[in-house]
Each structure stands twice: as structure tokens, then as C-alpha cells.
Amino acid sequence: MSEIGAATNLLLPIHEMQWNRWYYEREKLRLFSSFVLLGTSGAITAAEGALDTQYGNTYGIRIELFNYPHALPKVYPKGWTIQPEVAHRFTDGSICIMRSDQWRKHFSVALVVAKTAIWLNKYEIWKRNGHRWPGLEQKH
């Protein structure tokens, strides 16, 4: 299994996970000013926002937080469609930012946004270079 590297400012130390996790999640998410946490009935269920790429395009993103932080969040395009032939997406239409076995409960929603930004920039390169995914790849 390959471990995911992450900037420490996108991780949650134990005291932040145990105390008021959503307070710290909001603080870390401020690094991505267009993103907000959404909820119903007092529970946080998703995050939404938009990311700009190196080519000047903006992509809407919805992050579903089912069973968060114990399971990898699902990242979906919002207001656009992933080209169907791209390899790095799941069958449910969500974006593959990492494998579920790489997810750790100290990862934050902000880390998911950062990994999504990397995916989007690679996606734009993929669209321009004859559909070859740039960089290293992993099996799903």
C-alpha cells in the first residue's frame, strides 16, 4: 500500500480530532476560500466550492462526507461532467484522488480539496496531450 504524503497544515492532530473537529476543519478549509461545509439536522454532510486550474478554468466540486472521517469522502463534479474515457474516476462518477485504503482519519476536508486541485490540473493536461495521464499512477 502506498502512503499519501500531505502537508502538515492539512492534517488534524489528535487533540483537534477529539475536541471540536468541525471547528478545526473550518479553519483548515479557509485555505480554499470558495469552499464551505454544508449540513442538515445539525450534521455536516458535504463541502462545496470551486477550484481554478493552471489553464484558467474553474470547476465546481461537491465532496460527500458519508461516514466521515472514517471513510474516504466522495468527490463529484458540480455543474460539469468528467470525460467518460478518463481512467482516474470511479464507476459512480466520483473523482479518484486516492484509494480508500490510503485514507486516514486524521486527513482533513482541506486535504481532499488539495488532492482534488491536483487531480483537476492533471485532468486538464490529460485533455490536451492525447489522453495520457501525467505523473505516477496507481491501480484502483
Residue ranges of model-derived segments:
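UBC/E2-like fold recognition across ubiquitin and ubiquitin-like conjugation systems
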Residues: M1-G60, P69-H140
